[in-house]
Amino acid sequence: MARTHDDKWDLASSVGATATIVAAGRAMASRDPRGLIDDPFAEPLVRAVGVDFFIKMMDGEFDLSVLQNVSSAKAQAMVDGMAVRTKYFDDYFGDAIKSGIRQAVILASGLDARAYRLPWPADTVVYELDQPQVIEFKTNVLADLGAEPRATRRAIPIDLRGDWPVALRAAGLDTTAPTAWLAEGLLIYLPPEAQDRLFDNITALSAPGSTVATEFVPGIVDFDVDRARQMSGPFRDHGLDIDMSSLVYTGARNHVVDYLRAKGWDAEGVTRSKLFERNGMAVPAPSDDDPLGEIIFISAALTG
């Protein structure tokens, strides 16, 4: 089903299911003996969502490499890709903490548990924004686990297509102090004009010294819809009915690095291939890589 301007979802369907895919990847990467990341909450959150495909995958009862067109190398590339992505953004927040930033905003937070697992200073406030049912689900599951946030956590149940800047201010965001922003795994699910509007709003809410991190996928411009459908087919055969070709917004859009620089940010990007190399992992062959191609991870600081 194609996206609409007011579509809704939970963590087992549509865009929401991609948050569960990401959490399952983090759970599997957390077990990797190389120890690149450690997210102890990813697995119980995925189990609570209850999608059998992901649970079997995490438990080793379902080997992705048995799927048509999914080799063992491609399956490993999926897990390794989630490991380097998670570490990049974990390190980003670590650098923000070291610089003295004491408020963070995680946009479209999904099953992100960084408020619970990163070593935040006690006076830090972490804001999380996502659809109401997503916020409620994660909050309740983590409470049932007895998990406690390691910072002051302020969860804001709002669709990012709504007036989230007003909601964020109402929740206590101090726009006179630097903020560390995160938009992880979000941009491909936004129309081009909404991507620009997101960074316009972030800029308007940011004091000098603020930072933002995200990733940009140049391949979204000429996204191979047929290849994405082909890759989704085998998953559908095993009970996971997610068609990525219907969830993302394709077509020309501004490059995030260029757009942020034009807004006064000092922005830099690093390719995922470089992150694989930096972390001592093999760079996947093109045939084993993401159907969107290369991914650029971006961090930026607002000059003042």
Swiss-Prot record:
The keyword Protein biosynthesis does not apply. Gene3D superfamilies: Vaccinia Virus protein VP39 (3.40.50.150). The keyword S-adenosyl-L-methionine applies. S-adenosyl-L-methionine binds at D130, D159, L160. Keywords: Methyltransferase, S-adenosyl-L-methionine, Transferase. GO terms for molecular function: methyltransferase activity. GO terms for biological process: methylation. It is an enzyme of class 2 (transferase). Its EC number is 2.1.1.-. Exhibits S-adenosyl-L-methionine-dependent methyltransferase activity. This is Putative S-adenosyl-L-methionine-dependent methyltransferase MUL_0816. It comes from Mycobacterium ulcerans (strain Agy99). The lineage of its organism: Bacteria, Bacillati, Actinomycetota, Actinomycetes, Mycobacteriales.
